[in-house]
């Protein structure tokens, strides 16, 4: 990981760079056995604008002031998490969800950085990923998440669901 990565809210003028990052991420996923998680146009322009307008979209900036990654951190209920199959959530406490995390592949440790950022604000973090996304599944588990079960996306696709509960400070 670079020495001085910075996280800031995404601005509308960042969208062209985000589209490049998502294209790179889709190629990476396909080359690593996960060609189906993100459609060629995912996320849509409308989704990107909604994430920005809701204040949920963030970018990671490198020392050279380049956007190297992006993620969504949404606080509050995610409707797709209301029903979980083959398991259960660790608790019913308020949570934030990490979605659409992607990088340009040039900087390591982006997932850990996004999680640390999220944990500065929230004690409960949920995330989900496609069964075939082995790279993300490994990153999730290596960073202390617990596997909780299966959720269904708005389109009916299954996702593996995880939760991280921050330990209280003693």
State where each predicted segment sits.
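A short beta-loop-alpha structural element at the N-terminal edge
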Residues: 5-20
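Conserved GNAT-fold acetyl-CoA-binding loop/helix
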Residues: 26-46
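Conserved GNAT acetyl-CoA-binding A-motif
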Residues: 121-132
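Conserved beta-strand in the GNAT
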Residues: 59, 66-77
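Conserved catalytic-core motifs of GNAT/GCN5-like acyltransferases
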Residues: 128, 146-160
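Conserved acyl-donor/pantetheine-binding loop and adjacent beta-alpha core of acyl/acetyltransferases
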Residues: 72-106
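Conserved acetyl-CoA-binding loop-helix of GNAT-fold acetyltransferases
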Residues: 103-120, 138-142
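Conserved active-site alpha-helix within GNAT-family acetyltransferase domains
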Residues: 132-149
């Amino acid at each position: 990981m670079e020495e001085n990565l910075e996280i800031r809210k995404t601005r509308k003028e960042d969208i062209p760079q985000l589209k490049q990052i998502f294209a790179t991420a889709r190629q990476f996923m396909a080359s690593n056995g996960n060609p189906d998680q993100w459609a060629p146009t995912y996320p849509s322009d409308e989704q990107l604008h909604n994430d920005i307008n809701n204040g949920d979209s963030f970018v990671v900036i490198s020392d050279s002031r380049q956007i190297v990654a992006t993620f969504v951190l949404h606080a509050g209920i995610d409707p797709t998490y209301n029903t979980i199959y083959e398991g259960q959530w660790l608790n019913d406490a308020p949570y934030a969800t990490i979605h659409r995390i992607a990088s340009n592949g040039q900087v390591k440790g982006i997932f850990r950085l996004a999680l640390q950022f999220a944990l500065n604000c929230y004690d409960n973090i949920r995330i989900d990923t496609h069964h075939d996304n082995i790279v993300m599944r490994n990153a999730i588990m290596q960073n202390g998440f617990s596997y909780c079960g299966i959720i269904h996306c708005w389109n009916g696709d299954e996702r593996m669901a995880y939760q991280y509960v921050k330990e209280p400070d003693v």
